[in-house]
């Protein structure tokens, strides 16, 4: 059988590309090295619950056209991701915002929070992730919410990691724990695997 396109990888990108090709009359072969489709967005149903096997994925965009497009393939239930971090027996709001700074220092205004961070900010040569983090948010935030998490994630001390890993660290001087700033945020009610299947119109993956 002849195909116009061979798509390697049945994640969101590959599935959307496939759907667009098929919509324009092309024949597409989709292959994936894993024994399932969906890439890292793959969901499997366990006791009626759609489990995100590779960690939670929240779809988010400010583009109405994109939002309307994905909702053709499943209803994306609105969901606001507001994670919490546990450190030293206390919980802290993420991403770093005024709730976080109030929990850390008892401050209630952006001016107070900025003043503390400015005093603690590292101003030397940036040599590694530790320096970069301290330059961005100061010592307290680094020691409480970045150091141990980063070491666990990378299995290395932050001073042994390159600075570029944490160059874009979101810091908000407002009471807003919404992880994303996009207008549209949600999770497909039937899981991402259902979305991928709907996009590529197959019942079983080709391996």
Give residue ranges: language-model regions.
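Glycine-rich FAD pyrophosphate-binding loop
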Residues: 22-45
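A conserved beta-strand/loop capping segment in the N-terminal third of enzymes
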Residues: 42-51, 59-111
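A short acidic, glycine-rich active-site loop
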Residues: 53-57, 185-186
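A short, basic/flexible loop-to-alpha-helix module at the beginning of a structural domain
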Residues: 1
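A conserved short coil-to-beta-strand element within the FAD-binding core of flavoproteins
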Residues: 207
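Active-site/ligand-binding neighborhood in enzyme catalytic cores
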Residues: 85-93, 99-203
């Amino acid at each position: 059988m002849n195909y116009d396109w061979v798509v390697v990888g049945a994640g969101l990108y590959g599935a959307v590309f496939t759907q667009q090709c098929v919509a324009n009359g092309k024949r597409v072969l989709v292959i994936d090295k894993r024994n399932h489709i969906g890439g890292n967005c793959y969901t499997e149903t366990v006791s009626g619950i759609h489990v995100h096997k590779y960690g939670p994925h929240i779809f988010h965009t400010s583009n109405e056209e994109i939002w309307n497009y994905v909702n053709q393939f499943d209803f994306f239930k609105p969901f606001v991701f507001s994670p919490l971090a546990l450190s030293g027996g206390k919980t802290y709001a993420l991403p770093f915002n005024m709730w976080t700074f109030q929990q850390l220092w008892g401050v209630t205004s952006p001016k107070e929070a900025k003043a503390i961070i400015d005093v603690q900010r590292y101003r030397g040569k940036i040599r590694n992730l530790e320096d970069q983090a301290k330059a961005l948010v100061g010592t307290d935030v680094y020691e409480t919410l970045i150091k141990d998490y980063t070491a666990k994630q990378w299995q290395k001390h932050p001073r042994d990691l390159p600075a570029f890993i944490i160059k874009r660290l979101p810091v908000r001087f407002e009471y807003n724990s919404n992880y994303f700033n996009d207008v549209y945020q949600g999770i497909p009610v039937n899981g991402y695997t259902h979305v991928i299947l709907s996009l590529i119109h197959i019942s079983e993956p080709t391996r």
